[in-house]
């Protein structure tokens, strides 16, 4: 899929912008504060239902305005039944209002399911060296987009987990807890299996990507922590064993909501010794593997949104990454404060835009 038109009204530093990105590589160059990141933030907001930089009160609405509006037109690129779509997202007062193909949407998940955006921004490197919640969210995003029933499964597990935690806090009858344990284990085993299978698919894609971009790291796979000792006992038994402890703490201490995964290398002891540049490359390759899996399952590429791509990467790695991006038929949005040397060979296969004072001008 690729965006054919993006309209911003009263969003961050933009007053009114009507912009037409091209298929393929789109480079956005401008000084800090010019609006480059805000442009990608708007695309991210449409694809995720939230900003990666903060909430409305943190400055999403342009100073002096009372509301904001974002409209996106995009074209599906799958070979079969490809369609055009138009979506809008507005914020008035305390309320978000969304529309998709002329219909008001009740849940933003409907919009997120239609427009697939993979974003790489300044905090994305935390995917591999921060808390496990980010890594679970990474897997769940991919499953949400390629398995139609995954959202229902995830919501069911979240609901049952909430009910069990409520019973633990209230010290309810044992029979009630056993019933919820049974349901939690049934749904939790399914959720865990889906995540594990998805991570196995990603492994097959990540290894060749990293070997091509930074071969000295020698990644050989991922370690998946199920959230309990699954190789020793099923979840229902683990819940039974942990029941006394869970009563004491007032929450469920194990299960898929405690799962995690980490890259495994043969050349280094772990992610903790990676430089920021290496961490950025590993994270970016994980995201590109996810995009590739999306294509394999759906027949089209998601939109790739890469903020400040060149920072902390030397010219050699810039070139390798961009060479890879130029080979795939995805729409890629890339920002930077200047034109890095590694980008210049790829101008012939992309478009260059200058962002300044909330205006976007095509350079070539």
Swiss-Prot record:
It is found in: Cytoplasm. ATP binds at residues 30-37. Keywords: ATP-binding, Cytoplasm, DNA damage, DNA repair, DNA replication, DNA-binding, Nucleotide-binding, SOS response. It comes from the Bacteria. The keyword Protein biosynthesis does not apply. One of its GO terms (biological process) is SOS response. InterPro entries: DNA-binding_RecF, DNA-binding_RecF_CS, P-loop_NTPase, RecF/RecN/SMC_N, RecF_2. It holds the Pfam family SMC_N. The keyword DNA damage applies. GO terms for molecular function: ATP binding; single-stranded DNA binding. GO terms for cellular component: cytoplasm. The RecF protein is involved in DNA metabolism; it is required for DNA replication and normal SOS inducibility. RecF binds preferentially to single-stranded, linear DNA. It also seems to bind ATP. Belongs to the RecF family. This is DNA replication and repair protein RecF. It comes from Xylella fastidiosa (strain M12). The gene is recF.
């Amino acid at each position: 899929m690729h965006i054919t038109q993006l309209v911003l009204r009263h969003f961050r530093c933009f007053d009114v912008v009507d912009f037409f990105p091209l298929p393929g590589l789109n480079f956005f160059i401008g000084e800090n504060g010019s609006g480059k990141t805000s442009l990608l933030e708007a695309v991210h907001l449409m694809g995720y239902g939230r900003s990666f930089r903060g909430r409305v009160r943190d400055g999403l609405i342009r100073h002096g305005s009372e509301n904001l509006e974002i409209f996106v037109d995009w074209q599906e690129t799958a070979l079969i039944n490809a369609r055009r779509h138009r979506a809008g997202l507005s914020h008035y007062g305390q309320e978000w209002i969304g529309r998709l193909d002329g219909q008001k949407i009740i849940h933003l998940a409907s919009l997120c399911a239609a427009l697939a955006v993979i974003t790489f921004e300044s905090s994305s490197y935390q995917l591999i060296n921060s808390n496990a919640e980010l890594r679970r969210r990474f897997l769940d995003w991919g499953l949400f987009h390629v398995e139609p029933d995954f959202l229902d499964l995830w919501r069911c597990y979240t609901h049952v987990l909430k009910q069990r935690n409520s019973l633990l806090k209230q010290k309810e009858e044992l029979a009630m807890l056993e019933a919820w344990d049974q349901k939690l284990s049934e749904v939790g085993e399914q959720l865990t299996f889906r995540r594990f299978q998805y991570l196995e698919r990603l492994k097959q894609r990540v290894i060749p990507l990293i070997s091509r971009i930074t071969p000295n790291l020698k990644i050989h796979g991922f370690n998946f922590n199920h959230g309990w000792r699954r190789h020793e006992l099923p979840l229902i038994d683990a819940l039974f064993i942990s029941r006394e402890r869970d009563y004491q703490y007032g929450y469920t201490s194990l299960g898929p909501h405690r799962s995690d995964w980490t890259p495994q290398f043969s050349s280094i002891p772990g992610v903790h010794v990676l430089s920021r540049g290496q961490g950025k490359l590993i994270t970016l390759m994980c995201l590109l593997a996810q995009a590739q899996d999306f294509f394999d399952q759906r027949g089209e590429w998601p939109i790739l949104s890469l903020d400040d791509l060149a920072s902390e990467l030397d010219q050699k790695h810039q070139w390798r990454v961009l060479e890879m991006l130029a080979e795939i038929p995805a729409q890629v949005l890339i920002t930077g404060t200047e034109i890095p040397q590694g980008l210049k060979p790829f101008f012939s296969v992309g478009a260059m835009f200058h962002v300044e004072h909330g205006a976007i001008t095509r350079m070539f």
